[in-house]
Swiss-Prot record:
Domain of life: Bacteria
Summary of the function given for this chain in its UniProt record: NDH-1 shuttles electrons from NADH, via FMN and iron-sulfur (Fe-S) centers, to quinones in the respiratory chain. The immediate electron acceptor for the enzyme in this species is believed to be ubiquinone. Couples the redox reaction to proton translocation (for every two electrons transferred, four hydrogen ions are translocated across the cytoplasmic membrane), and thus conserves the redox energy in a proton gradient.
SUPFAM superfamilies per the UniProt record, alphabetical: Nqo5-like (SSF143243)
Lineage: Bacteria, Pseudomonadati, Pseudomonadota, Gammaproteobacteria, Lysobacterales
The name this protein goes by in its record: NADH-quinone oxidoreductase subunit C
Source organism: Xanthomonas oryzae pv. oryzae (strain KACC10331 / KXO85)
Xref: NCBIfam families: PRK06074.1-1 (NF004730), PRK06074.1-4 (NF004732)
Length: 250
């Protein structure tokens, strides 16, 4: 598997100069990371030149708060979860609030990552018996914009609509970019890490108006139900050691 993956990454490196290529061993999972400006051209080349005729999945990813936890499990804790955990991760707050982090100058707003929103596609080549993960980061966190690939793989239509609905990622050139899971009056994008877990509106039936109404959330108090834990122990040594190769193609 490692030999096959190495040969495949050599082909990718020769074709896509400047792209980031990583291989996870021993499974041989290959990830190709390209700039958002090259997203459409890369996908087209992968289909027409490298035989990736099927896109099996496409999703959005929000890296806000990536790598930060709420409960330290590296040693014996004097503050077990049964004793309460202070919410530090994103999403633990009411609408409009934002998490903070401690620094020498006191509590400061949590820093936004330079590359927050990503689009990830899973491709399959039946003729070469090969799978490939392709990823790009939207250059603008305020308005994450990535080219649509519906003209390359028409089946991606609803996947892109889902990523738009849940993450707010805009796919330029999509023929029908509208919400697909939430209703048309929904405020915000619920899979963003800064979207409050309690939501921002609640729905009830109003007897006087004889219709469903949306109102600001007032009946739910934000709290940590399950702490965000990032474990660093033997169970994750294999996963951490699987990245066998990460290089910049030249």
């Amino acid at each position: 598997m490692a030999e096959q993956a190495s040969s495949f990454t050599d082909r990718l490196a020769a074709r896509f100069a400047g792209a980031q290529i990583a291989v996870a061993l021993p499974r041989g999972e290959v990830t190709l990371e390209v700039a958002a400006a090259d997203w459409h051209a890369t996908c087209l080349a992968l289909r027409d030149e490298l035989g990736f005729e099927q896109l099996s999945d496409l999703c959005g990813v929000d890296y806000l708060g990536y790598g930060s936890g709420e409960w330290d499990t590296a040693d014996v804790s004097s503050q077990g979860f049964s004793r309460g955990v202070e919410g530090k991760a994103v999403g633990r707050f009411a609408w409009g609030e934002f998490p903070s982090q401690e620094s020498s100058a006191g509590a400061q707003p949590q820093q936004l990552p330079k590359q927050r929103f990503a689009v990830v596609a899973q491709l399959i080549s039946y003729q070469h018996n090969q799978r490939l993960r392709v990823r790009c980061y939207a250059p603008d966190e305020q308005v994450p914009l990535v080219a649509s690939v519906t003209d390359i793989w028409p089946g991606v239509n609803w996947f892109e609509r889902e990523a738009f609905d849940l993450f707010g990622i805009v796919f330029d050139g999509h023929p029908d970019l509208r919400r697909i899971l939430t209703d048309y009056g929904f405020v915000g994008h619920p899979f963003r890490k800064d979207f409050p877990l309690i939501g921002n509106v609640e729905v009830r039936y109003d007897e006087e108006r004889k219709r469903v109404v949306y109102e600001p959330v007032t009946s739910v108090e934000p709290r940590v139900g399950v702490p965000r834990v990032i474990r660093d122990d033997a169970r994750y040594e294999t996963a951490a050691g699987e990245v066998g190769r990460s290089e910049t193609a030249k």
